Amino acid sequence: MRFAGKVWRLLVGIKDGLVLVFMLLFFSALFAVLTARPSPASVRDGALLLALDGAIVEERTEVDPFAALLSGQAPMGEYQARDLVHALDKAAEDDRIDAVVLDLDRFVGGGQVHLQEVGEALDRVRAAQKPVLTYATAYTDDSMLLAAHASEVWVNPLGGAVVAGPGGERLYYAGLLDKLKVNARVYKVGEYKSAVEPYNSTGMSEPARENARALYATLWEEYRANMKKARPGADIERVTTQPVEWVTAARGDLATAALQAGLVDKLGSRADFEKRVVELVGDDEWGEGPNAYPHTTLATWLSDNPLPTKGKSIGVITVAGEIVDGDAGPGVAGGDRIAALLDEALDNDLAGLVVRVDSPGGSVLASEVIREAILRQKARKIPVAVSMANVAASGGYWVSTPADRIFAEPETITGSIGIFAVVPTFEETAAMIGVTTDGVRTTPLSGQPDFIGGFTPEADAMMQAFIENGYEDFLSRVGAARGMTRDQVDAVGQGRVWDGGTARQLR
């Protein structure tokens, strides 16, 4: 019995050992299978996929998740121009990337300056002998300008491509305000300061029309020049000057018309496009769908290619969006927030400061808060440069004045040296429904501002004087910064906007 017990224990031990070996082999094989499948967060040999589901921006807007949840809508995607340029430049020199694929089906746009910056980065990818392919159901001005830099532009046969050019119409509310008996009190300095016109006019003034025509003509010329350079074979003149004849010649087929005009290279479905990418980079055995190809997303690629940190630091501050009082942003230029960021950097050993401006302006007070913070940096005797993106106008120019050098692109919209305010009062609206006001004043300013009873003549005059003083401050800041007299600045000011190329020549 003792011998049988030993044999039994031996057999049980062998069984347990075999089970353990089997389990080790099973989990080793399972681990090998799982690790063989590429992680979505890892860079793969193949294509760099830029699925631009949204807009190219200077600075991403801070999203309030609670507000997004209440709205029931996902926020629009935003892609920083500098991230895209950096990603493309790294793709051009990295052997793991064989091609760049742009999915522009849900691309919203980005402004000519950003589009040109990204387009030039695409050119550098092509110069490295790597193909660039784009796909969209339909192309419009911005997506077409970006796609023009690709080696292959694909469009869905049921889609097309249309280039409309800058311009259009805006809404004017003066007639509505008259019917509602709302008094829109306009205070401004600047013959060309057209932002107030929707509130006191039913159409464009001649100065505003003149300014818009000149600006749009220059922007349009830059657009066409960039298109011709990127796609020499595209008949952009016919597409934009004879659109009806162009489309009619293709029997109303916009996709075929785009192909015939050289705007696109291929007509095909998304599946056809993906087959073409597979031909260039190979198929993805782990991918889903019949035409999957190995690719790396933008987020993964940026994580694998951080910005360089060597050398002495150069501070970069972004002023993007409307300039407002307080701590708003990013994506909105809160004056206090940006000033705090600049002041935090006072203790850093900076070789210089670059202020990147992409703003149409806003609050004068917030603009001055930012300007003063830039001056505190400049007091350290470091060089300060301003780099203008799509727009650096009004308050956007105000914050640029401390710079030693200002850089702009030909397509940059700048200037708009002028100040305005619009204050609605409802005395006639109230009277229309039987509400009136009365009282006693000790001074002409007692009870002012009164939005229901209206402004006194003295309050009106003081408001206009305040705006005029602000304009004189603006002129003096620009004059001191650019070495111009007050009258020289006034001659190019008056609220007029300029393209970057023309602004460079003004004196």
Name every feature range the model reports, one short phrase each.
Residues 233-260, 266, 481-507:
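Amphipathic alpha-helical substructures
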Residues 1-252, 274, 278-481:
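Small-residue-centered hinge/linker elements
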Residues 154-155, 264-270, 407-408, 507:
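Short acidic-hydrophobic, aromatic-tinged amphipathic segments that line or gate anion-handling sites
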